[in-house]
Amino acid sequence: MNVPGDLRYTKDHEWVKLLADGATALVGITDFAQSELGDIVFVELKPEGTVLGEQEIFGTVEAVKTVADLFAPVAGTILELNGVLDAAETVNQDPYGEGWMVKMKVADPSSLDALMDAAAYTEMIGG
């Protein structure tokens, strides 16, 4: 299972990557999550400009087997949706790269410190 060391992780299998400006982050689902979901057929996300609280639902992922909610790992505002997700299988193929879900302005960048690092996430998923 691929768990990049430069990301932070949630118990709900989302990842967060703080960008160079220190206030903007990319959010997506982990390799473990996409593997458990199976073939992803549709991704629905809240619109740009949506203000989210920590753990607030920001969208859903529909797979052949199930539908799963997406939870905001930190509070912030959605700045951009990943347009590539019209081809939802991108999430299965590249969950940490082209398959990111939203770009968001993080309300408090230090809140990422409360999320799991790669070692803790790997332990949680039994890796």
Curated annotation (Swiss-Prot):
CDD domains: GCS_H. The modification N6-lipoyllysine is found at K65. GO terms for cellular component: cytosol; glycine cleavage complex. Its cofactor is (R)-lipoate. It comes from the Bacteria. Keywords: Lipoyl. The keyword Zinc does not apply. Residues 24-105 form the Lipoyl-binding domain. Binds 1 lipoyl cofactor covalently. GO terms for biological process: glycine decarboxylation via glycine cleavage system. Pfam families: GCV_H. The keyword tRNA processing does not apply. NCBIfam families: gcvH (TIGR00527), PRK01202.1 (NF002270). The glycine cleavage system catalyzes the degradation of glycine. The H protein shuttles the methylamine group of glycine from the P protein to the T protein. Belongs to the GcvH family. The glycine cleavage system is composed of four proteins: P, T, L and H. PANTHER family: GLYCINE CLEAVAGE SYSTEM H PROTEIN, GLYCINE CLEAVAGE SYSTEM H PROTEIN-RELATED. This is Glycine cleavage system H protein. It comes from Chlorobium phaeovibrioides (strain DSM 265 / 1930).
